[in-house]
Design a protein with these regions (language model features):
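Core of compact, soluble alpha-helical bundle domains
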Residues: 30-76
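Immediate flanking context of iron-sulfur cluster ligation sites
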Residues: 86-106
């Protein structure tokens, strides 16, 4: 049993046991403030090196943004939202789809990156409305990158 500064015992609560508070107060607000979030990501040497290729731009032009959004929703729902995604940390390829590039650029590629950058607790499924926030964030990055 843990104790506080005065020696009073208390039951430690893991971050995953209070997911809504952690998400609502930190992550969702940070992701919705795209300018601040993108500025923060640009300061990372690793994150700032990701950009859409010409092939990615052609793919977006061929498929349209509505299709890219559907792909994004599917990738987030199946590869990122489960409490313990299969192959976590390796589930997002480094190339091959504009959404994959956006996920790495925006630190939304695995649960470890979501936890580190956006305080999304590990081991807790991401609810549908929060998945939509991640999708909106990734699509905003793609739209910025794809702008002429």
């Amino acid at each position: 049993m843990a104790t506080n500064e005065s020696g009073t015992p208390f039951r430690a609560i893991s971050q995953s046991q209070h997911c809504p508070e952690a998400w609502d107060m930190v992550t969702y607000a940070a992701m919705k403030n795209y300018g601040v979030a993108f500025s923060r990501l640009r300061k990372s040497r690793f994150r700032s090196r990701f950009h859409l290729s010409e092939a990615d731009r052609r793919y977006i032009a061929e498929k349209g943004m509505a299709t890219i959004r559907r792909h994004c929703e599917d990738f987030i729902r199946t590869r990122l939202a489960p409490a313990n995604p299969p192959n976590d940390g390796k589930q997002t390829p480094m190339r091959g789809h504009p959404v994959f590039i956006a996920q790495h650029a925006c630190a939304c590629c695995c649960r470890d990156c979501l936890a580190k950058w956006w305080k999304v607790p590990r081991g807790v499924a991401i609810p549908a409305e929060r998945q939509q926030g991640i999708v909106d964030f990734l699509m905003a990055w793609i739209e910025r990158e794809n702008a002429p």
